[in-house]
Regions:
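Canonical P-loop GTPase G-domain recognition
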Residues: 3-15, 146-204
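Conserved nucleotide-sensing/catalytic segment adjacent to the nucleotide-binding pocket
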Residues: 68-106
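Helical mechanochemical/support elements of P-loop NTPase systems and associated helical scaffolds
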Residues: 22, 48, 61, 88, ...
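Conserved C-terminal guanine-recognition region of P-loop GTPase G domains, centered on the G4
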Residues: 97-169
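Hydrophobic aliphatic residues
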Residues: 43-47, 100, 163, 189
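Conserved nucleotide-binding/hydrolysis micro-motifs of P-loop NTPases
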Residues: 58, 71, 78-81, 116-118, ...
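Conserved G1/Walker A P-loop phosphate-binding module
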Residues: 1-83, 194, 199-204
């Protein structure tokens, strides 16, 4: 994917109406310290488009990034931050649920899991909830550069078994630092958001 233009086009808060976008969307969800903003920046070849922070739980809105006037990458609020109040967690949950139910252009949901650790209870809850909503989440195993190459397959297996993923579920090991996994991730995204003839043209 050649990134020609990227714009943070819409930011939705608790009371905002979900936009009726003209292009297909893919959404990214993950625990608040999983590296979602860094992954989006690496994916889009931008250093600080999605704001990163040492403080978990920074993303508290749904952010719509228009890419090449052809698709939207949607950054959902991070979940599972311990210092977030119960009322705030409930609001974020309703906001995400509203988006999943309301968006007419959502084609796929990606769930980010830290490849270094077993999936948390919140990760499992989010995965099961997405499946219940009718999606088959694609898993992005982040922070790939933090483990040895010899550990990759073992850790991916731990994620697969920990989430009890559906057969055939795609798991993409990804590093925001080295951008390993970026091309594979774009191939998966393109398969959902681009017309078939355009995808075939890019493969030539």
């Amino acid at each position: 994917m050649v990134i020609r233009s990227v714009n943070l086009e819409t930011v939705c808060g608790i009371t905002s109406k979900i936009p009726d976008n003209p292009f297909n969307e893919v959404a990214f969800a993950g625990k608040s310290n999983v590296g979602k903003s860094s992954m989006i920046n690496a994916l889009l070849n931008r250093k600080s488009l999605a704001r990163t922070s040492a403080q978990p739980g920074k993303t508290q809105t749904i952010n719509f990034y228009n890419v090449n006037d052809a698709m939207y990458l949607v950054d959902l609020p991070g979940y599972g931050y311990a210092k977030t109040s119960a009322s705030e967690k409930e609001k974020w949950g309703k906001m995400i649920e509203n988006y999943l139910h309301t968006s007419k252009k959502l084609q796929a949901v990606f769930l980010l899991i830290d490849i270094r650790h077993d999936p948390s209870a919140n990760d499992k809850m989010m995965y099961d909830w997405m499946v219940y909503q009718g999606f088959t989440p694609i898993i992005i195993a982040t922070k790939l550069d933090k483990i040895k190459r010899s550990q990759i397959q073992k850790n991916v297996k731990v994620i697969r078994e920990g989430l009890k993923v559906k057969p055939g579920t795609v798991i993409i090991p990804f590093s925001s630092e080295t951008k390993q996994g970026r091309d594979e991730l774009w191939e998966v995204i393109d398969s959902f958001v681009l017309p078939q003839e355009e995808t075939e043209e890019e493969d030539k």
